Amino acid sequence: MKAYTVEQGIVAPLDRANVDTDLIIPKQFLKSIKRTGFGDNLFDELRYLDEGYPGQDNSVRPKNPDFVLNQPRYQGATVLIARTNFGCGSSREHAPWALNEYGFRTVIAPSFADIFFNNCFKNGMLPVILPEDIVDQLFKECAAQEGYQLTIDLAAQEVRTPTGEAFKFEVDPFRKHCLLNGLDDIGLTLQNADAIRAYEEKTKQVRPWVFQEIN
């Protein structure tokens, strides 16, 4: 998993509350668990004017010109700002997979659905909770300035605007450690690889039948 330290990037504003996971990545695209291949269908119902289905050539589909991710000024965005209860609905982990593959490493909102919030950390993304009035301010600044960027400093737990204004955010120390060091569940386990091997060798001496192959 790629480490998250300091991220600076263009901001895309998604100005709607209660964005659920089916809107983030519709159910018809959940036929793979490879974690890849979902970015082109992120917000499919909002990005395209036709109905999406797996295997389509998205490059020839008619796009919704009014949707934020189709507007030239937001191309290359890596920071998404959203409204309350972002990521509600089903627990599909494909939602952060789609956001991540599109290019978003940070989502800023006043609140998140719990399962989506947890899944972001497991997939190298940082969900940042800021007070609603500050999120309102970010929306206004983003609308007023083309190419608006934010800097997110995980070590300092700060979101910084182009003018240098800084907003503090909270993050669980363990999750912070994992993101800073690029550790997912597998990476955390491998940190104890020597201890695991030592345990297995010891167990082979005490209970050798456990390790016998069954033909």
Curated annotation (Swiss-Prot):
Keywords: Amino-acid biosynthesis, Branched-chain amino acid biosynthesis, Leucine biosynthesis, Lyase. Its EC number is 4.2.1.33. One of its GO terms (molecular function) is 3-isopropylmalate dehydratase activity. GO terms for biological process: L-leucine biosynthetic process. One of its GO terms (cellular component) is 3-isopropylmalate dehydratase complex. InterPro entries: 3-IsopropMal_deHydase_ssu (IPR004431), Aconitase/3IPM_dehydase_swvl (IPR015928), AconitaseA/IPMdHydase_ssu_swvl (IPR000573), IPMI_Swivel (IPR033940), LeuD (IPR050075). CDD domains: IPMI_Swivel (cd01577). It comes from the Bacteria. It catalyses: (2R,3S)-3-isopropylmalate = (2S)-2-isopropylmalate. Pathway: Amino-acid biosynthesis; L-leucine biosynthesis; L-leucine from 3-methyl-2-oxobutanoate: step 2/4. The keyword S-adenosyl-L-methionine does not apply. Belongs to the LeuD family. LeuD type 1 subfamily. Heterodimer of LeuC and LeuD. Catalyzes the isomerization between 2-isopropylmalate and 3-isopropylmalate, via the formation of 2-isopropylmaleate. This is 3-isopropylmalate dehydratase small subunit. The lineage of its organism: Bacteria, Pseudomonadati, Pseudomonadota, Gammaproteobacteria, Moraxellales. The gene is leuD.
